[in-house]
UniProtKB/Swiss-Prot annotation:
Domain GST N-terminal span(s) in chain numbering: 3-82
GO cellular component terms given for this protein: cytoplasm; cytosol
Swiss-Prot/TrEMBL keywords: Acetylation, Cytoplasm, Detoxification, Phosphoprotein, Transferase
Gene designation per UniProt: GSTU22
Residues annotated as transmembrane: none
Modification N-acetylalanine occurs at: A2
Pfam families assigned to the protein according to its UniProt record, in alphabetical order: GST_C, GST_N
Residues carrying Phosphothreonine: T149
Protein name listed in UniProt: Glutathione S-transferase U22
Its EC number(s): 2.5.1.18
Subcellular location, record wording: Cytoplasm, Cytosol
Family per similarity comment: Belongs to the GST superfamily. Tau family.
InterPro entries listed in its UniProt record: Glutathione-S-Trfase_C-like, Glutathione-S-Trfase_C_sf, Glutathione_S-Trfase, Glutathione_S-Trfase_N, GST_C, GST_C_Tau, Omega/Tau-like, Thioredoxin-like_sf
Amino acid sequence: MADEVILLDFWPSPFGVRARIALREKGVEFEYREENLRDKSPLLLQMNPVHKKIPVLIHNGKPVCESMNVVQYIDEVWSDKNPILPSDPYQRAQARFWVDFVDTKLFEPADKIWQTKGEEQETAKKEYIEALKILETELGDKPYFGGDTFGFVDIAMTGYYSWFEASEKLANFSIEPECPTLMASAKRCLQRESVVQSLHDSEKILAFAYKIRKIYCV
């Protein structure tokens, strides 16, 4: 009997896209269900009663929540193709450390870039660039955070890469002069087939970002 794989998601989400990419890296057939986050479906509330957030992967009726937890689950269940996490325990621990850094240090300033203006937005841009510079140092001269292989940290970052262009246009700043090596890796990731299949057009993301700003009266 074939696995039933359902993904509850929201198209512009930098977190939901991680699950989409991981599934496509593994060649897993799945049913995509778009969620209205202002009117969440009974299935989402049932499958993620604690946080009530996307993405939720439902595998044979069992839910897995939180984006990078979902990615790790996908890697472990469909382990015969394109490993996402390294096999070495130390390298796995390091990958998890940097993913935690990504979501701890990037999310809040990124959110403020989209939702604020003036001095608050300027502070957010500085914090964002500072965190990206630390990530660029960790990346070094490698093509990917996983070395020669697209992996766990790259998937986490691709959610943010997908919003780089919109963030730059919204807040009138440029990431590449500050982080050229990171941007080169970002462009490499964004050209990957699993990523291209999982992302929407940057202009559509920008239009959505302007809607967010209107909601917050910015």
